[in-house]
Amino acid sequence: MGARGPGPGATARRRLLALLLLLLLLPLPARAWYKHTASPRYHTVGRAAGLLMGLRRSPYMWRRALRPAAGPLAWDTFGQDVPPRGPSARNALSPGPAPRDAPLLPPGVQTLWQVRRGSFRSGIPVSAPRSPRARGSEPQPELGASSWTSAE
């Protein structure tokens, strides 16, 4: 009896082994060539790459950081037995002395504000006086149906 060669199962194993080696040689899926591999997907190599590299937080977070920090809310700082104090505790529509650092209005505007505030409580409508420039100006021309047609 002579030596036999490899059987039909051996050639199938060799083919399977060769196929597995070829699969190992294939490259892994890669990202696009113009994107950084070690950064989030919105950091590109394009014209905004330098600007985007510093934005690692969400836009909502850095917008919130840009706003000035608000103090505690008025209703959070007072107990039930403690009356509120300070300018934020006053009602904005209630009359009272203005703070010393409040800007003063010109006398004409001040009287108009006081009259308007008084008429708001009584329900009387108040209109502002016309400006002196409007009194001396010519009346505006009336627009009729003929003004919309062409003068042919």
UniProtKB/Swiss-Prot annotation:
Residues 65-152 form a propeptide. Its main location: secreted. One of its GO terms (biological process) is G protein-coupled receptor signaling pathway. Residues 96-106 have a biased composition (Pro residues). Pfam families: NPBW. One of its GO terms (molecular function) is G protein-coupled receptor binding. Residues 1-32 form the signal peptide. Residues 79-108, 122-152 are annotated as: Disordered. GO terms for cellular component: extracellular region. It is found in: Secreted. Keywords: Cleavage on pair of basic residues, Neuropeptide, Secreted, Signal. Plays a regulatory role in the organization of neuroendocrine signals accessing the anterior pituitary gland. Stimulates water drinking and food intake. May play a role in the hypothalamic response to stress. Belongs to the neuropeptide B/W family. This is Neuropeptide W. It comes from Sus scrofa. The lineage of its organism: Eukaryota, Metazoa, Chordata, Craniata, Vertebrata. The gene is NPW.
